[in-house]
């Protein structure tokens, strides 16, 4: 059996595995853990009362986080003409059309988000096998296929959490960084969960927000009391 590291021992000494924390308590614990050489993300997992095997219970969307994510994202936009100019003015890092598609096919993937104007999807559609597995394929459900590419760029740059329920019925996304205040994380979590409640499928029965877990990249998963987040505040 491998020995626990000093950091792992400290983590174990600080958490109660059976306890349900408030987000404020969880953020305090994550922020107080020994720092690593890189800035860790604060991630949230929300177990939903859905059956993702049913097409009408697949929950997918995007939330504009009030406090941002703490990370600067590089945004690529497929657009031409006035839409391309608007994307550039909004701060897009890469703007193109067929030329951008060829660059991606050649292996150039220096971006975190891909946005496309509707008329660009005939070009973007050729990239499904490249962008799809990386979670980068533009989709109208998360606002990345839109005639208003400038607004989409601004949202991505400001801090947006995209999510899609996995096979286990869980949403995973990033809502901040270690070093964020509890208030910042609470604002982001509440915005996300509010959007999730609004996205509840009509066919979903029983408790919808079943379980919430907060964690850092290399830290523990802390169970959050879900009851306060099951109804609108």
From Swiss-Prot:
Molecular function terms from GO: rRNA binding; structural constituent of ribosome; tRNA binding
UniProt GO cellular component terms: cytosolic large ribosomal subunit
Keywords: Repressor, Ribonucleoprotein, Ribosomal protein, RNA-binding, rRNA-binding, Translation regulation, tRNA-binding
Transmembrane segments annotated in the record for this chain: none
Keyword tRNA-binding appears in the UniProt entry: yes
Matching SUPFAM superfamilies: Ribosomal protein L1 (SSF56808)
NCBIfam families: rplA_bact
Protein name from the UniProt record: Large ribosomal subunit protein uL1
Organism this protein belongs to: Psychrobacter cryohalolentis (strain ATCC BAA-1226 / DSM 17306 / VKM B-2378 / K5)
Gene: rplA
């Amino acid at each position: 059996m491998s020995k626990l590291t000093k950091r792992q021992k400290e983590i174990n000494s600080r958490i109660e595995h059976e306890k349900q924390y408030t987000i404020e308590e969880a953020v305090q614990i994550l922020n107080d853990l020994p720092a690593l050489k890189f800035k860790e993300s604060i991630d949230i997992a929300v177990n939903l009362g859905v059956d993702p095997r049913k097409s009408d219970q697949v929950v997918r969307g995007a939330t504009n986080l009030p406090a941002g994510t703490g990370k600067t994202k590089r945004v690529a936009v497929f657009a031409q003409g006035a839409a391309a100019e608007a994307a550039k003015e909004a701060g897009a890092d890469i703007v193109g059309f067929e030329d951008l598609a060829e660059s991606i096919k050649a292996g150039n993937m220096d971006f975190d988000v891909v946005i496309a104007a509707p008329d660009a999807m005939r070009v973007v559609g050729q990239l499904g096998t490249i962008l799809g597995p990386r979670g980068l394929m533009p989709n109208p459900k998360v606002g990345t296929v839109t005639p208003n590419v400038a607004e989409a760029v601004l949202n991505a740059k400001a801090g947006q959490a995209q999510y899609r329920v996995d096979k286990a019925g869980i949403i995973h996304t990033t809502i901040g960084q270690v070093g964020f205040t509890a208030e910042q994380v609470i604002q982001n979590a509440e915005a996300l969960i509010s959007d999730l409640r609004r996205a509840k499928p009509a066919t979903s029965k029983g408790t919808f927000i079943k379980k919430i877990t907060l964690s850092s990249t290399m830290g523990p998963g802390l169970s959050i009391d879900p009851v306060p987040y099951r109804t609108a505040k």
